[in-house]
C-alpha cells in the first residue's frame, strides 16, 4: 500500500480526492494482463531502461551529433538571428505551425540529397505511416522486404492496396511476384540498411528490375543517413540512383542525432502528401527549435568528414577483430554501423547482454517477438566516438561469455 507521506504534495482536498481516484483506478482487462504475463514468462517483457554511463554500443547516435556542442550553439544562434524564438509550433503546418525555418530546412535537405522536394514529418514512424497509408491505392500492389521496419508494416496495414512480402534481399522472389501481377501499379519497398541485420540490398539490380516492370521503388534510408556515401548522404545517392528511385524516407534521430524525418521525391509527390498523408495533416508540427536543429545538423554533416571517416575505421576494425577472435560465424554479414550476433533464446541473449553491461559496455539484447524466434541477437551499434580499444575489449568479452575462453 502507498504510504500517506507520498501524497504530501497535494495541497487541497480536491487534489487528494483525485489522487485517491487514480490510486483506485480499474485494473487492466484480464486479456491484457494475460498478454503481459505471457511476455514475462517468455523472458520477452519490454521495460524502459535507466540512463547509464556505460560505453555506448547501443544507441543510433552514429556520429555523436546528439551531444555536439557546435550543433547546439549554432541552432541557438540561427533561431535568434531569424527571430524564431517560439517554444512550440502552435498547430499543424496547414494551420499555424508552418514557420519559415521549415521552408529553409526542406530546401536545404532537397538540395543536399539531389531531390526535387522534401517534406518534413514529426518522426520516421509518422513518415512511413503517412506515405504507405496514403500513396498506394486500392488495386495497387505493395511488395516489401520481409525484414522491413514495423513503421512500414503499420503504414501498409492502413493502405487499401494489396501487399506481399518478399524474401529478404531476394531479387528472384521480387521478380516472381512482379511477373504474377502485370498491368498493376506496384511499389517495391526496401531499406538501405536493415535495422536488425545491418545489411544492405543490391539497389542497382533492384532498380533495374523495377524499371523492367515499371514499378516504383521506395527506400527507407533511416540507418544510412550520415553513414553511407561520401558525405553521409545515404545509399541511393552513393550508387547514383536518386533520379530513378520514386521516394526516399530520411530520418534524423540516428546519424543526425536529432529528431524528425523527411520524405524526398517530386514536387507533385510532396503536394500529394500535404493533401492526403494523415500523419502530416492531423498533428502539431515540430517546434522551430527542432527544425532548426535538423537544418544545423545537415550543415554540420557537410563538414564532418573526420568523424565519418572515424566511424568507417571503427566498422573496419570491428570486422577485423570479430574475424581474429573467431566470432564471424555468429554475426550477420554487415559493412554498416549495425553488427548483430545471433544468439538464439531470449534468456541466453539477455544473460550475455547483462554480463557485458556488468563489465561496463552498453550492448542491448534484441528479443523475440521483435525478431523471429531463434533469431534473438546482440546488436552492436558502432559510433565515431568508440575507441578501437573499446571495440577489441567488448568483442574479447563476448568471446569469453559465448565460448568460455
Predicted regions and their residues:
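PLP-dependent aminotransferase class I/II
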Residues: 255-322, 329-331
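Conserved PLP-anchoring active-site segment centered on the Schiff-base-forming lysine
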Residues: 131-150
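Conserved N-terminal alpha-helix of the aminotransferase class I/II PLP-enzyme fold
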Residues: 80-123, 315
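Conserved PLP-binding catalytic core of the aspartate aminotransferase-like
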Residues: 65, 310-316, 325-359, 382-384
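Active-site PLP attachment segment
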Residues: 231, 237-272
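Active-site phosphate-binding strand-loop segment of PLP-dependent enzymes
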Residues: 164, 168-219
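PLP-dependent enzyme catalytic core of the Aspartate aminotransferase-like
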Residues: 23-24, 67-69, 73, 111, ...
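N-terminal "arm"/small-domain region of PLP-dependent enzymes with the aminotransferase-like
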Residues: 26-87
Amino acid at each position: 500500500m502507498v504510504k500517506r507521506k507520498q501524497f504530501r504534495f497535494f495541497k487541497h482536498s480536491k487534489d487528494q480526492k483525485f489522487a485517491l481516484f487514480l490510486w483506485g483506478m480499474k485494473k487492466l482487462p484480464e486479456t491484457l494482463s494475460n498478454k503481459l504475463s505471457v511476455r514475462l514468462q517468455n523472458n520477452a517483457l519490454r521495460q524502459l531502461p535507466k540512463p547509464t554511463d556505460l560505453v555506448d554500443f547501443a544507441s543510433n547516435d552514429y556520429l555523436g551529433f546528439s551531444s555536439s556542442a557546435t550543433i547546439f550553439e549554432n541552432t541557438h544562434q540561427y533561431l535568434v538571428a531569424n527571430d524564431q524564438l517560439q517554444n512550440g509550433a502552435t498547430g499543424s503546418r496547414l494551420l499555424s505551425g508552418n514557420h519559415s525555418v521549415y521552408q529553409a530546412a526542406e530546401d536545404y535537405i532537397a538540395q543536399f540529397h539531389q531531390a526535387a522536394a522534401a517534406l518534413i514529418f514529426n518522426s520516421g514512424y509518422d513518415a512511413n505511416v503517412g506515405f504507405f497509408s496514403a500513396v498506394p491505392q486500392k488495386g495497387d500492389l505493395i511488395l516489401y522486404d520481409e525484414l522491413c521496419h514495423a513503421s512500414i508494416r503499420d503504414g501498409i496495414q492502413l493502405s487499401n492496396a494489396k501487399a506481399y512480402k518478399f524474401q529478404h534481399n531476394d531479387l528472384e522472389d521480387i521478380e516472381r511476384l512482379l511477373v504474377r501481377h502485370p498491368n498493376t501499379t506496384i511499389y517495391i519497398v526496401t531499406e538501405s540498411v536493415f535495422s536488425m541485420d545491418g545489411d544492405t540490398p543490391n539497389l542497382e539490380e533492384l532498380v533495374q528490375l523495377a524499371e523492367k516492370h515499371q514499378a516504383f521503388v521506395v527506400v527507407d534510408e533511416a540507418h544510412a543517413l550520415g553513414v553511407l556515401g561520401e558525405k553521409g548522404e545515404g545509399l541511393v545517392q552513393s550508387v547514383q540512383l536518386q533520379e530513378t528511385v520514386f521516394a526516399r524516407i530520411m530520418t534524423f534521430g540516428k546519424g543526425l542525432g536529432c529528431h524528425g524525418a523527411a520524405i524526398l521525391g517530386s514536387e507533385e509527390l510532396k503536394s500529394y502528401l500535404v493533401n492526403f498523408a494523415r500523419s502530416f495533416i492531423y498533428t502539431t508540427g515540430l517546434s522551430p527549435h527542432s527544425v532548426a536543429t535538423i537544418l544545423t545538423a545537415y550543415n554540420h554533416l557537410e563538414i564532418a568528414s573526420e568523424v565519418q571517416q572515424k566511424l568507417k575505421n571503427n566498422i573496419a576494425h570491428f570486422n577485423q577483430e570479430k574475424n581474429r577472435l573467431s566470432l564471424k560465424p555468429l554475426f550477420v554479414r554487415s559493412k554498416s554501423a549495425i553488427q548483430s550476433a545471433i544468439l538464439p533464446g531470449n534468456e541466453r541473449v539477455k544473460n550475455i547482454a547483462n554480463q557485458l553491461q556488468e563489465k561496463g559496455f552498453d550492448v542491448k539484447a534484441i528479443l523475440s517477438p521483435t525478431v523471429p524466434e531463434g533469431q534473438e541477437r546482440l546488436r552492436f551499434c558502432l559510433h565515431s566516438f568508440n575507441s578501437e580499444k573499446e571495440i577489441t575489449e567488448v568483442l574479447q568479452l563476448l568471446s569469453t561469455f559465448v565460448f568460455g575462453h
